[in-house]
Amino acid sequence: FYVTKVNRRYIATLGLSLVLLGNLSSTQSPELIILMISRFCAGIGAGICYATCTASLAGSHNSARTFSILLFVLVAMNALIFYIFPIIDGRWGVNGLFIFFLLEALPIFFVLPLLPRYCTEESGENIRVSEPNDPELQVQIPDILPRMCLAAVFSFYILVGAYWAFIERAGAAANINAGFVSGALTWGQVFSISATLLAVWLAKRFGQSKPLLFALFTMVVTMLVLADRVDKLTFIFSIFSFSFFWIFIDVFQLGTLSNIDHSGRYASLVPGFQGVAQAFAPTLAGTLLYYQLGYSSVMIMCALASCIALCIYLYVYKRLLELAPVVADSN
């Protein structure tokens, strides 16, 4: 909540400093306690930076394009990391990875002056939208709507956390070759880049809400297909469908919150809700497996999580159509 009150350049500087301090400390001692503290410090710093980034981008008036660029960069960096980390680890060990994180953070200090110091719009429930008959209409948006969007983010990331934690094991349990599984996961990540490009086009044509609802529905179907049976065909279908629509949904979730609240207060909370859900989901899925309910039960749980998010966004969309149609179908 400080993101709307404190100079964002100071917040980002604090986050980057924690990242640098945490990664530098990680190289100094192999002691478990020290390493845990230093990784916690680096993680908090990275979270602060990510939250400040999403809050600042929320002020954009073309949020689908803005967050598509953000997700494109994240996916591209993940692909680079998958390629370069084994090389770094093989040559310099785990300390090499920490140094990589440290060096990666240093150049960001040079772009801090580009960050907006403060939100340019008032935080609260008044959203300025354009109507044909009244170009500066003030519309009252209930605070419950962005909060419901955060609940939907949490629910969807239950799916994400559980799926990523157990999809490889589900493939192995179905006697799918490990090389096939690894290849499908890699190419699925590469394929997901196309989602960031398609999201911009769809947002311009249909707005953000309709593609978001369709993507969540498709994710429900994908999980139910995998719950029915796991073989090579359904496995590769689920990997490519999940990888594509995950990025797709992320763009529109952030974009929807940004259209409702340009202050960035709620968008800055998205990384926290994502992280907590991803930490909680494997435990929940593991409990189902502990009681020998099988991987199909995990996929059904994932389908339910996506269905809950779908229902929440459907309600939010209907309310926005009543209150501010331009916001409901904004790109």
Residue ranges and their predicted role:
Residues 206-253:
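C-terminal transmembrane helical hairpin of 12-TM major facilitator-type secondary transporters
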Residues 47-61, 247-261:
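Intracellular juxtamembrane helix-capping segments at the cytosolic ends
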Residues 60, 69-120:
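Helix-loop-helix hairpin linking two adjacent transmembrane segments in secondary transporters
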Residues 144-186, 190:
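Extracytoplasmic gate region of multi-pass secondary transporters
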Residues 1-30:
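Conserved MFS/SLC helix-loop-helix module at the cytosolic interface between two early adjacent transmembrane helices
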Residues 1-8, 195-208, 289-290:
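Helix-to-loop junctions at the C-terminal end of transmembrane segments
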Residues 260-294, 302:
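A late C-terminal transmembrane helix in Major Facilitator Superfamily
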Residues 22, 33-41, 233-241:
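Paired small-residue
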